Amino acid sequence: RNPATIADNVGDNVGDVAGMGADLYESYVGSILATFSLGACAGYGWEGMILPILLAVCGILCSIVGTFFVKTEENATQKSLLRSLRTGTYLAAALSAAAAAPLTWFVLGDWGVYAAILCGLVGGCAIGYFTEYYTSDTYKPTQKLAAAAETGSATVIIGGLSLGMMSTIASILIVAAAILISFYAAGGGASFDRGLYGIGIAGVGMLSTLGITLATDAYGPVADN
């Protein structure tokens, strides 16, 4: 009944569901179209152009399967809820990795491209893990920051700023490693265009399980309401 609470919940839905969904959808479609174009430039022909689209379809189906494994019990703790959501996300990624192998071989016959896809999937899961590590109250970084609040607001501001800066290091290193590995795995040493295609297909692989990832991100606003 509090208008401020209602406005806060509406803001959560607008920002964390509608806004984030539009942002991630734009990234998803952009990566598919970019890889579509790079497939033609790299000399793969229509096979290289259709692969990112098929990979996206495969990822959507695997995301749907992963949602069926997100199960909780009555009066479950927050830790068990997060574990259940994590299980569904990782399972969808594993299914996508397994399905991408025969798909890539049938369409292109190039295991290097599959290695780039796998690199993107692993990198996406790793970024998700480190994001949870630095933001969840079940891990030490946020627990230490909460303990710092006992000494005053200054320590919270300083500690929060430093923690936020440190939290980006892992993601930066993972993205850099994924770009480098996927570039050379797809044949970037011999052909620059094929290396760029490897980076693009790795991005599609990283975003292929966007369906369940976006559903997991929407858990917060839904739970608040």
Please tell me what each predicted stretch does.
Residues 1-225:
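Hydrophobic packing and interface segments
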